[in-house]
A protein has these predicted regions:
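Conserved N-terminal phosphate-binding loop of PLP-dependent enzymes in the Aspartate aminotransferase
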Residues: 1-448
Length: 448
């Protein structure tokens, strides 16, 4: 089918996510035909670096032969089977591998199919765990402004990005939100590192106010993704974990975006020496190739669900594609590549170069802040550097950046007033230098 006909049918039937569809009538979506390695290719043969890892999930590059072969073999043997009263080798092996590499104490794995469901599972497990233990008063959650945990109802209820919540307030449950550790816009009016990370005090206050009614604290460790690519110090996370423990609340860490080496360690929470009660994983779990998610938890939580058939302690939650064998096979192949190719070490080695390259753009007009961690780097654009007034996300400059990036072979998708790179862990030094050159050229031309 030719390009024009495909796009015409797309606009007739498809409803794209996070998209004002009326704009596509004059500026249709990019028709991607194939992908290979670090690149996307459109239907006209143009090549683009996948500079946002296809929404933050790509790890080893597109079409890695090892993952492709693992998926093909599994499809030929067992494509899918329910996971209630049934098990299979890929799920058993993957659960064992995840428990082996996870932070200490996380020995139980519940599979689902995307990041939102991984978080939803953690929220429900925390609530029911307390109920099973006779602590039914613990029903509340503490979360962060600018935090984002997914688009299902529970996830939205503990998120703090207003654009995603505004239309759905009537169906959300209340949660205690505290200011984010947002160094550029410090809620305490201080400057890191001399601040003593005093912004965490608000979290302590919320836990004291909530008392025995708080079920869990939920955080994205070290990087608030959809809230603006806000990187924050490991000290905040370690103190937040200590506060949750002090007040007897569970700690849920959402590593859907940060897991699997993205920040320079296998899991971001490792940089703070933190082991949560629940760890939520997806995106990079399969190397970014197949829908799969996992919620890891402790033996203590797991044991609270054990009882007789009539005990009321069973966890009544599941998904059709729970532990899909093909997804598990992809994840196992991805984990093999981590071990064989030194993926995490490569990220740690190249992260300073990414940070250095983006810092060179700090002096450009409208650039208020430059931040990042690991393979993530972001620029926050402001209309006034003195007042830090955010540039509206609807400002024409963001469209210009996206289009200029594509002209230079970079696939970018600015988010609000933030322009960012979220690079695959497979990036080489040569490719990184090329990406930075194209990214810098894009910003300098548009913001000059």
């Amino acid at each position: 089918m030719d390009r024009k006909n495909l796009l015409r049918r797309d606009l007739r039937h498809n409803w794209h996510p996070y998209t004002q569809m009326s704009t596509l009538a004059t500026e249709p979506p990019t028709l991607i035909d194939r992908a290979e390695g670090l690149f996307l290719f459109d239907a006209e043969g143009n090549r683009y670096y996948d500079a946002i890892s296809s929404w933050w999930c790509l790890v080893h590059g597109h079409g890695h032969p090892r993952i492709r072969e693992a998926v093909t073999r599994q499809m030929e043997r067992l494509d899918h089977v329910l996971f209630a009263g049934v098990t299979h080798e890929p799920a058993v092996r993957l659960a064992s591998r995840l428990a082996a590499i996870a932070p200490e104490g996380l020995s139980r794995v519940f599979f689902s199919d995307n990041g939102s469901t991984a978080v939803e599972v953690a929220l429900k497990m925390s609530l029911q765990c307390w109920r099973n233990l006779g602590r039914e008063e613990r029903t509340g959650f503490v979360c962060l402004d600018h935090g984002y945990h997914g688009d299902t109802t529970g996830c939205m209820s503990v998120s703090g990005v207003e654009a995603f919540l505004r239309a759905f307030r009537p169906i959300l449950f209340p949660a205690r939100r505290v200011p984010a550790p947002y160094c550029y816009r410090c809620p305490a009016g201080k400057t890191h590192p001399g601040c003593g990370v005093s912004c965490v005090d608000a979290l302590g206050d919320a836990l004291r106010e909530g008392g025995d009614t708080v079920a869990a604290v939920i955080l994205e460790p070290l990087l608030l993704g959809a809230g603006g690519m806000i990187a924050y110090p490991p000290e905040y996370l370690s103190r937040a974990a200590a506060l949750a423990r002090e007040h007897g609340a569970h700690l849920i860490l959402d590593e859907v975006a940060t897991g699997f080496g993205r920040t320079g360690t296998m899991f971001a929470c490792g940089q703070a020496g933190v082991s949560p009660d629940f760890l939520c994983l997806s995106k990079g779990l399969t190397g970014g190739t197949m829908p799969l998610a996992a919620t890891l938890t402790t033996a203590e939580v797991y044991n609270s669900f054990l009882g007789g058939p009539d005990s009321g302690k069973t966890f009544y939650h599941g998904h059709t594609y729970t532990a899909n064998p093909v997804g598990c096979a992809a994840a196992l192949a991805s984990l093999d590549l981590f071990e064989e190719e030194g993926v995490v070490d490569r990220v740690a080695r190249l992260a300073p170069r990414l940070a250095e390259g983006v810092r060179e753009l700090a002096g450009l007009p409208l650039v208020g802040d430059v931040r990042g961690i690991g393979m993530v780097a972001a620029l926050e654009l402001v209309s006034d550097k003195g007042t830090k007034e955010p540039l509206p996300g609807t400002a024409p400059v963001f469209r210009e950046i996206r289009l200029e990036g594509m002209r230079r072979g970079l696939f970018l998708r600015p988010m609000g007033n933030v322009v960012y790179l979220f690079l695959p862990q497979a990036v080489t030094r040569e490719a990184l230098d090329d990406i930075l050159d194209r990214f810098g050229g894009t910003l300098r031309k548009v913001l000059r």
